[in-house]
Amino acid sequence: MSLNPKDVVIVDAVRTPMGKSRNGQFRHVRAEKLSAQLIQALMARNPNWDIQLTEDVIWGCVNQTKEQGMNIARNISMLAGLPRTSAAQTVNRLCGSSMQALHSASQSIMTGNGDVFVIGGVEHMGHVAMDHGIDLNPEMSKVTAKASNMMGLTAEMLGKMHGITREQQDAFGVRSHKLAWEATQQGRWDNEIVPIEGHDQNGHKVLCEIDEVIRPGASIEDMQKLRPVFDPANGTVTAGTSSALSDGASAMLVMSAERAQALGLKPRAKIRSMAVAGCDAAIMGYGPVPATQKALARAGLTIDDIDYVELNEAFAAQSLPVAKDLKLLDKMEEKVNLNGGAIALGHPLGCSGARITGTLLNVMEWKDGQIGLATMCIGLGQGIATIIERV
């Protein structure tokens, strides 16, 4: 297909394997190092990339303190060996942070404010807990439900509103692990995972090449044994149907089509449209629905035009209502999360947006699809969506 000079193209996308946050393979590896090694991998994989042209490094990260503080994007940029003349910024749209990084870079390219960007995100939830240092304002209870900051309870609420059963959630959780492990065994992650040095259970250095969060033997019987964790008396959401805490990073090289052509780089996809949207904080998991509807309208598409979808699996009780209202529930096995999702891989908050977009691109190449949708929910009631098209 023909490209316009200012079309935003994705040249490459990579990620780390996902590590368990509790005594996992990256327990002795810092967030900056996970990220810097991805940028170095992008350099190695794309030797025609003139790094001197890099305008900005935009990195998503949610809890920006401790090793993730002091503008981690700039620290990553310098550790990776990018020129000092390239700028760097860290962005925070909670779970959608690294997808927002992609949007911010795309908007800059579209408006002529730079040609070459490195975007990505990271969260080391083993080193910096999700709630570390958080001081919530009690006055928030005047404007939204008191449980709006408790993600598991928002999933319970959304699931109840849409009649999602415990059995449906358990089946969805097993599906995620099954598909993710199949993808591992069949090498479908190989083009996106960059092996990273970590440590085994005995503390010995090892090269980490697979997602350690996946449970290959996950079964319905095992899921049924788990108790609800957020609403023990009446709930349906368990640890097995929630995204795991994990450590990981993701990265993309994006630029204008004219710059990619000038450098002799072959784009893999272009950005068709982008959108963010708000929803009630008490059902924050619903955000992908209005965000996707906006993105589809901006691209002049309908959901039937989308070949493949990556929907971040914060919770099964959240993902299923979104799939239902996007008219995807009957097409799950054909086009949604064909390599599993965050229930199996975990959800390192700042990492996930670029991760699912990169995974979407690889699924589209594997299945020879043309148009794909990546979308995710965001805490306190937001959604974000990106539509890409292969070129």
Curated annotation (Swiss-Prot):
EC class of the enzyme, as a word: transferase
Residues annotated as catalytic: 95 (acyl-thioester intermediate), 347 (proton acceptor), 377 (proton acceptor)
Catalytic activity, as annotated: an acyl-CoA + acetyl-CoA = a 3-oxoacyl-CoA + CoA
GO cellular component: cytoplasm
Keyword Cell cycle: no
E.C. number(s) listed in UniProt: 2.3.1.16
InterPro entries membership: FadA, Thiolase, Thiolase-like, Thiolase-like_sf_Thiolase, Thiolase_acyl_enz_int_AS, Thiolase_AS, Thiolase_C, Thiolase_CS
Biological pathway: Lipid metabolism; fatty acid beta-oxidation
Subcellular localization: Cytoplasm
A matching Pfam family: Thiolase_N
One of the GO BP terms on file: phenylacetate catabolic process
CDD domains recorded: thiolase
Keywords (A to Z) from UniProt: Acyltransferase, Cytoplasm, Fatty acid metabolism, Lipid degradation, Lipid metabolism, Transferase
Gene Ontology molecular function: acetyl-CoA C-acyltransferase activity
UniProt xrefs under Gene3D superfamilies: 3.40.47.10
Family: Belongs to the thiolase-like superfamily. Thiolase family.
Summary of the function given for this chain in its UniProt record: Catalyzes the final step of fatty acid oxidation in which acetyl-CoA is released and the CoA ester of a fatty acid two carbons shorter is formed.
Complex formation: Heterotetramer of two alpha chains (FadB) and two beta chains (FadA).
Official protein name in the record: 3-ketoacyl-CoA thiolase
Organism in which the protein naturally occurs: Alcanivorax borkumensis (strain ATCC 700651 / DSM 11573 / NCIMB 13689 / SK2)
